């Protein structure tokens, strides 16, 4: 995953999304000058073959003594990045905002391409007027933008290019219940069982790298989110031929146990629960924000890393909650807040489920998400299902107090209570006690917050979502007992029109003209 800056790494230094990990004793003095030469640069955005909507890489500020900065470097000099086509004959638009300062000595650089280049890119990373690490980084291969339809034919090659994990624990766990997948049974059972008038099931077939689907049930508008991700994935790698049912509703739907007769069927969903057997994908929320980073969304998993508020010691020592009334415990939070304002600041920003409570509890003003991190503690309480804000909260540098929940997302399996967050009982009866604990054990609370943030940075990298989606489709296809087909009522989901952008795919063989 790394660029050529990896050549500078000491033997004991690990690089990932979280950044180089050195012992605290080796941190640079905050007043030390930055060494451009000894600073580090790495990440998928320095690799030509890693095509994602917004490419990204990381920079670690290092002192002349070879020590990592753990705070923003002193002075007004900043890192800057210049990216352009390697060949002067190629012209493409590349949006390159300033690197995001993650307030821990590392910086996150994002760039979005609006056209492809066949000769490669030149990426200059500078501190002042000096090149950082191995800058300039020369990507000599074709570099494709998001909408260039140029899939890698060999999925093993693609997974290697993307540095996909060899195993995803949640995928392994989800498929234990389904050693084989009987498509014929699913064709008979799922439309009847799950797609009544109020259903939210979409029937997909992927064949020859084309996406086909039909909607089953009334509430399937959220297929727009699954469509865009499957299409994006198909532009990057040849997908297996596979046929499946995707639940685009909030709740998981398959609650039968393996030893039931009949047993469960493998419905794919965005959220799982301890009493269901659905196969889980990354939520529509994190995938859509990944697709629309630097364009159509304000909160995404990259931008939030440069907007985490004041340093830990300068944050407000209270817990914060803002959100809709989508679960009764959220109303209880507001009552606790009114009784204990010195510990908790909680408010409901919109009423739908419990409108009769608005007069009693009041309505809080909307609050910019980045402003959440002015507070030292964040309360995460379920909505209708798992609160989709949880990954964003983890990426900040506040301590997350997470309500015990029967629901989970695809990455929860990589988290542990008291290591990455502080657990709170389902009924919130110990919430105030946990806030008091955090205030009385500030250093331990800070360590948990930091470990949660570092782990989230690793698990929630955008390219990991593409790996995850592909592995679910691959595993599903491997277990199908019959060949997928385009069924009656299915329609082709076309790739978006991108005719105004340059896209010359070197992987596609030119058409031969008959002589």
Regions found by a protein language model. Give the residues of each.
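Hydrophobic beta-strand positions in extracellular immunoglobulin-like domains
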Residues: 61, 111-113
């Amino acid at each position: 995953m790394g660029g050529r800056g990896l050549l500078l790494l000491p033997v004991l230094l690990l690089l990932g999304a979280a950044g180089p990990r050195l012992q605290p004793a080796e941190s640079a003095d905050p007043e030390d000058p930055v060494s451009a030469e000894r600073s580090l640069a790495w990440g998928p955005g320095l690799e030509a073959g890693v095509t994602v909507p917004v490419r990204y890489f990381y920079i670690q500020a290092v002192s002349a003594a070879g020590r990592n900065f753990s705070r923003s470097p002193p002075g007004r000099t900043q890192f800057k990045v210049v990216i352009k086509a390697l060949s002067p004959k190629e012209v493409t638009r590349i949006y390159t905002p300033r690197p995001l300062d993650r307030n821990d000595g590392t910086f996150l650089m994002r760039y979005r391409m609006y056209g492809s280049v066949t000769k490669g890119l030149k990426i200059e990373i500078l501190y002042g007027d000096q090149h950082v690490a191995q800058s300039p980084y020369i990507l000599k291969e074709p570099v494709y933008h998001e909408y260039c339809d140029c899939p890698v034919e060999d999925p093993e090659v693609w997974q290697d290019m993307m540095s996909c994990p060899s195993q995803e624990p949640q995928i392994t766990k989800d498929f234990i219940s389904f050693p084989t997948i009987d498509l014929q049974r699913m064709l008979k059972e799922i439309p009847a069982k799950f797609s009544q008038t109020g259903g939210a099931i979409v029937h997909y077939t992927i064949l020859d790298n084309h996406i086909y689907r039909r909607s089953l049930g009334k509430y399937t508008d959220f297929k727009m989110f699954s469509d865009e991700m499957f299409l994006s994935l198909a532009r990057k790698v040849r997908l297996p031929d596979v046929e499946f049912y995707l639940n685009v509703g909030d709740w998981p739907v398959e609650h039968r146990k393996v030893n039931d007769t009949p047993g469960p069927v493998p419905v794919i969903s965005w959220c799982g629960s301890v009493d269901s057997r659905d196969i889980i994908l990354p939520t529509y929320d994190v995938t859509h924000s990944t697709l629309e980073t630097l364009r159509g969304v304000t909160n995404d998993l990259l931008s939030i890393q440069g907007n985490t508020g004041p340093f830990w010691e300068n944050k407000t020592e209270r817990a914060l909650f803002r959100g809709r009334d989508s679960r009764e415990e959220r109303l209880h939070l507001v009552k606790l807040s009114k009784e204990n304002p010195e510990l908790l600041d909680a408010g409901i920003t919109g009423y739908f489920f419990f409108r009769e409570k608005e007069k009693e509890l009041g309505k809080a003003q909307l609050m910019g998400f980045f402003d959440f991190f002015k507070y030292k503690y964040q309360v995460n309480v379920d909505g209708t299902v798992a609160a989709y804000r949880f990954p964003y909260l983890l990426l900040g540098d506040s301590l997350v107090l997470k309500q015990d929940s029967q629901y989970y997302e695809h990455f929860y399996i990589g988290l542990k209570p008291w290591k990455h967050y502080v657990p709170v009982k389902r009924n919130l009866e110990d919430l105030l006690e946990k806030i008091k604990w955090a205030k009385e054990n500030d250093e331990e609370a800070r360590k948990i917050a930091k470990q949660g943030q570092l782990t989230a940075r690793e698990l929630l990298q955008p390219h990991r979502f593409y790996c995850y989606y592909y592995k679910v489709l691959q595993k599903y296809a491997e277990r199908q007992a019959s060949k997928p087909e385009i069924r009656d009522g299915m329609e082709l989901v076309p790739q978006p029109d991108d005719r105004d952008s340059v896209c010359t795919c070197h992987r596609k063989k030119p058409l031969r003209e008959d002589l």
